[in-house]
């Protein structure tokens, strides 16, 4: 049984995503610092933050709701990385998209587990 949200693979992968997004956006054009960079970093930070907040809730239903919020933020990050690539701010986000897909599967599994009452 997991005793702390930091033990959750979903949270750990979410933290990896945050580090990756911050590294990727470090060299974005200055004009994008309050546009795409801000949106990307906020969405990325939202993934592990929502997992942690959900873990602190008292019911599996509430926890599942926050994990679903994290999943929504994950899809935001994916879309924004594709936009960044299309605009020429990053070269290739294929590996990042694959990591996002893996984390999405982990989040889906966690949601299913919580809904079934095994969270």
Predicted regions and their residues:
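Amphipathic alpha-helical assembly/interaction segments
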Residues: 1-119
């Amino acid at each position: 049984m997991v005793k702390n949200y930091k033990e959750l693979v979903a949270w750990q992968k979410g933290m990896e995503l945050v580090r990756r997004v911050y590294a990727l956006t470090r060299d974005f054009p200055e004009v994008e610092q309050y546009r795409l960079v801000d949106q990307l970093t906020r969405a990325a930070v939202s993934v592990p933050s929502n997992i942690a907040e959900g873990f602190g809730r008292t019911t599996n239903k509430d926890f599942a709701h926050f994990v679903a919020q994290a999943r929504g933020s994950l899809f935001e990050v994916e879309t924004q990385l594709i936009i960044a690539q299309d605009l020429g701010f990053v070269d290739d986000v294929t590996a990042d998209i694959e990591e996002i897909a893996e984390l999405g599967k982990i989040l889906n599994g966690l949601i299913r587990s919580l809904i079934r009452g095994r969270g």
